[in-house]
A protein has these predicted regions:
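Juxtacatalytic C-terminal regulatory tail of Ser/Thr protein kinases
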Residues: 84, 101-113
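The N-cap/first-turn positions of alpha helices
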Residues: 31-34, 75, 516
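Amphipathic alpha-helical protein-interaction segments enriched in hydrophobic
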Residues: 479-484, 513-524, 548
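Acidic, proline/glycine-rich low-complexity intrinsically disordered segments
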Residues: 2-7, 12-13, 17-26, 30-62, ...
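Minor-groove-contacting beta-hairpin "wing" of winged helix-turn-helix DNA-binding domains
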Residues: 88-100
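Residue cluster at the C-terminal edge of the helix-turn-helix DNA-binding motif
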Residues: 37, 77-85
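C-terminal non-catalytic interaction modules
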Residues: 534-581
Length: 581
């Protein structure tokens, strides 16, 4: 883009002219180059080393610190900016600078080629009116499937609020208007299910939140073998009701209609996968496996199975190399059957990044997933994580914010945004966002972990220690928590305690997978470089997904001067935009 606009200013990149309204603002070459670099990457931390390489390369004999400080001072003066209360340029202590004003460029779009929709719809949890509480999986599973189907049907014209925010209102007595205001949703779909033997009764109604006006309602009484047709009919009727002028026709993704048992297993898998953290992961894996065993051509179930297999690697329920290979097989099968399944493309993006280090292919897969279903929050979240790992922090936060708009109460999405702030060096913001997440769920272990890491980098080691000790009360034998605690103990000078924690983590290897990547972190804290690199080499052989964060993670800074570090990063295929920063 030739013209970059921000606030009252615009910079013509070709003519190198900065203007405020009709007036030309005089700016010397170096401040102008710094401004251009910041405008290309709004929200990103531009490090002092990066500025040195860009403006004062090797062989330039200047007092770098004095020259950079003078250039920043002149730039702030030209913009009328205040270093203490910045409207444009924020100083990130010990790192560099960040441009904090929005810059409306295509590159800063939250999603590849899609703007946020103006209208949003929330599918509220369907009530289970059956006497049998074990049928809860059916009402919750139906809710989740409607969320999944309406995304592609509405094709980005109407944003579909995600499952975490939807499930928050399960059993709520709040009025439609209040729920709509809380989630910024204009429409609500609500209903109930009642199962009696081989018959099922489903009632659904579409409501305009602001006026609480019912736009459409329908009651279905079918045999359980017709669940699929009911679900497809409900999704289609919603999309064609008052929303029909906004929504182009699209094909819903449904299961094979001659496999009702597979669909029932699929719903049970969705129900388990919706549970917090990794609580239901193993059960979800079992049900999705049963679904695709009964119906090998069930593409949506194969995609869901692939997603859970990736999660098995991320949560270390299984050796990552094994789990990711299984996920690739499932995702490939899903796309061969139906290339329009958004989730299968999103998982394929994860696998390109985790297994192959092919970041361009990963970005293309995420883009396709979001194109097929712009309400796919998991795809947006994964895309944001990839951007953060490439040091494209402004774009990463924009993608995460788009996902958060669709599912504001999803802890995973909020955590990705917080982690992005942490690796960008914005520790105080990361700390504040972690505390907000812990207000939502005080037992969210990931938030305690990121909070501890940010506190440690901010020089508040005792507080970091307290957070990890608190996290351990929720899961006393988690090897990652033990490794992170060992790292903090080591940094604080408690060597014997750190070594004891490492030994405790390693003792778990008899019964479960203990990720060497996190043991490497503990050894780094102790200054044990040989042990750290040995563990990182093993993490590479295991294809640990966390290894992609190596060059982003500030706690590994002590290893970066070691001659073994750069070859390892090259082997992992961490993106060039990160390497050398």
């Amino acid at each position: 883009m030739a013209i970059l606009r921000f606030g009252d200013f615009e910079l013509d990149v070709r003519s190198r002219e900065l203007r405020r309204g009709s007036a030309c603002v005089r700016l010397q070459e170096q401040p102008l180059e710094i401004l251009r670099l910041m405008l290309e990457r709004p929200g990103d931390v531009i490090t002092r080393d990066e500025l040195r390489q860009r403006l004062w390369p090797d062989g330039t004999f200047v007092d770098f610190e004095h020259s950079l400080n003078a250039a920043i001072k002149r730039l702030r003066a030209a913009l009328g900016d205040d270093a203490d209360r910045p409207a444009f340029i924020e100083t990130v202590p010990r790192r560099g600078y960040r441009f904090v004003c929005s810059v409306p460029t295509e590159r800063n779009s939250a999603t590849p080629g899609h703007a946020s929709p103006d209208l949003r719809l929330v599918v509220l949890p369907f009530s289970n009116l059956s006497d049998d509480s074990s049928q809860e999986y059916f009402s919750d599973g139906l809710t989740e499937e409607l969320i999944a189907q309406l995304g592609p049907l509405c094709r980005g014209q109407v944003g579909i609020i995600g499952r975490w925010s939807s499930m928050f209102f399960k059993g709520s007595l709040q009025r439609a208007r209040e729920i709509g205001e809380a989630l910024k949703a204009e429409y609500l779909l609500e209903g109930s299910t009642r199962r009696d033997g081989s018959r099922v009764r489903i009632t659904a109604r579409l409501v305009e939140a602001a006026t609480e006006t019912q736009l459409w309602s329908e009651t279905y009484e079918r045999s359980t073998a017709d669940w699929l047709s009911v679900q497809a009919d409900v999704a289609g009727r919603v999309a064609r009701s008052r929303l029909r002028e906004l929504v182009p026709p699209a094909r819903a993704i449904v299961a094979p209609r001659d496999h009702p048992r597979a669909y029932q297993a699929y719903l049970k898998g969705k129900y388990q996968w919706a549970r917090p953290g990794d609580v239901g992961l193993d059960e979800a894996l079992r049900w999705f496996t049963e679904a695709v065993t009964d119906a090998p051509d069930f593409a949506a179930a194969l995609a869901a199975l692939a997603r859970v297999q990736v999660a098995s690697a991320e949560y270390y329920h299984e050796m990552p190399r094994v789990a990711l290979a299984a996920a690739r097989e499932s995702a490939t099968r899903a796309l061969a059957i139906d290339p329009t399944v958004s989730e299968a493309h999103a998982v394929t993006g994860d696998l390109y990044r985790m297994l192959d280090g092919d970041w361009m292919a990963a970005e293309a897969s995420y883009a396709e997933a979001i194109k097929l279903n712009p309400s796919n929050g998991a795809a947006l979240r994964s895309y944001g994580l990839m951007l953060a790992l490439e040091s494209r922090y402004g774009e990463a936060l924009a993608a995460v914010e788009r996902a958060r708009e669709l599912d504001p109460l999803c802890l995973g999405t909020n955590n990705t945004g917080t982690w992005t702030r942490y690796v960008s060096g914005d520790y105080e913001s990361a700390i504040a966002h972690c505390r907000s997440m812990l207000e939502m769920d005080p037992e969210f272990v990931s938030a305690h972990c990121v909070l501890a890491a940010a506190l440690l980098q901010a020089g508040r080691g005792d507080e970091a220690l307290a957070q990890l000790n608190l996290a351990l009360t929720f899961d006393p034998s988690h090897p990652v928590l033990l490794s992170w605690l060992a790292h903090v103990k080591a940094v604080l000078g408690c060597r014997s305690q750190a070594q004891a924690l490492i030994a405790r983590a390693r003792s778990l290897e008899r019964t479960r997978y203990v990720p060497p990547f996190h043991l490497a972190l503990a050894h780094t804290g102790l200054g044990e470089r040989d042990e750290a690199f040995e563990a990182l080499d093993q993490a590479w052989l295991d294809r640990d997904p966390a290894l992609a964060t190596l060059d982003a993670e500030p706690r590994f800074e002590p290893l970066r001067s070691d001659p073994r570090y750069r070859p390892l990063v090259e082997r992992i295929k961490i993106p060039r935009s990160r390497v050398g920063v």
